[in-house]
A protein has these predicted regions:
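Active-site rim elements
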Residues: 2, 32-34, 194
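Short, conserved, GDST-rich strand-edge loop motifs in beta-rich repeat architectures
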Residues: 28-41
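Residue-level detector of Asp-centered blade-edge/turn motifs that repeat once per structural unit
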Residues: 17-19
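Blade-edge beta-strand/turn elements of extracellular beta-propeller
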Residues: 1-7
Length: 290
């Protein structure tokens, strides 16, 4: 990170990585702080950050073969990567062998770039989504879900295999993916994800909330069938607090009437009633007063 203590005119406004790996920073460099003199129109500075003694040079880049394009796809400069990506995409299945070598490397960013391209090869999307969904790295498994959404690969089959994934962030991505799903299977998949929610994980909770939008009644009902009387746990209360189903208000009322609920937690449940349907909220408030 660059900053200047003495030079008050130093105002870095943009940064870019050059094809040789050096970093360029553009400095607005307004010599007058405040006022309308507009002296910045004809002023400015560029800084290059690189190892000591390193001279700027334009690396030799070629996009004629899959091997050369894959090498360019690893470049830190996004313009180089853009040209490489488009060239590889046009090659289609002819580039698959070289892309697979890149995918099998240890560099996570390189693996992700290769997977995005392989997933766009005509007729191969489902294969690479399936392959990525079984990967040891949770970031690649997340990418499998995003690739499925972008390529139109049936999401239900992908999510079904991943609802019990050991990684919370993969399960969150499953929930986000469910937002795009309609039909009978959605509620049961949502319930499976909700069962695996970790109490206190707000990111997980919000992902589940986004997934259930417009389908709260069926989603919550399916979850309640799975948990039965065991809904009254810390993670179960999380789900109820975030839910917007017809049953939610009365369940919140049960939580509020429970003497074991700490006093410090009660305001959040009362606040949760504000997000429920008015008629059901009134019914719940009457229950609380009884």
């Amino acid at each position: 990170m660059m900053k200047s203590i003495k030079d008050r005119s130093f105002r870095p406004v943009d940064v870019a990585v050059a094809p040789d790996g050096s970093i360029f920073i553009s400095d607005w460099y307004d010599p007058i702080i405040g006022g309308l003199a507009q002296r910045d129109i004809s002023r400015g500075r560029l800084y290059r950050i690189a190892p000591k003694g390193s001279r700027y040079g334009q690396p030799k880049l070629d996009y004629g073969s899959a091997k050369e394009c894959v090498n360019a796809l690893k470049n830190p400069n996004y313009c180089v990567r853009y040209k490489a990506w488009n060239a590889l995409h046009k090659m289609g299945s002819k580039a698959e062998k070289e892309l697979m070598k890149m995918f099998l490397s240890k560099n996570l960013r390189h693996r992700a770039r290769a997977l995005w391209l392989m997933g766009k090869i005509e007729g191969r999307s489902a294969h690479f989504v399936d392959m990525a969904s079984k990967d040891q790295d949770p970031n690649i498994r997340i990418l499998a879900l995003r690739l499925a959404r972008q390529t139109g690969t049936p999401l239900i089959k992908v999510i079904e295999k991943m609802t019990s994934d050991p990684s919370a962030k993969v399960r969150r991505e499953c929930a986000i993916s469910l937002t795009h799903v309609r039909g009978d299977k959605k509620a049961s998949l949502w319930a499976s994800l909700a069962i695996n929610h970790d109490a206190g994980d707000r990111w997980s909770l919000e992902a589940l909330g986004i997934a259930a939008e417009n389908d709260w009644d069926s989603c919550l009902s399916s979850w309640l069938k799975l948990v039965g009387d065991d809904w009254d746990t810390d993670k179960g209360k999380d789900i109820i607090w975030r839910s917007r189903a017809k049953e939610s208000s009365l369940l919140i009322a049960k939580i509020l009437k429970d003497p074991k609920v700490p006093e410090k937690d009660r305001p959040r449940y009362f606040r949760a009633l504000d997000f429920q349907d008015a008629a059901q909220r009134e019914e719940a408030l009457i229950k609380i007063l009884e």
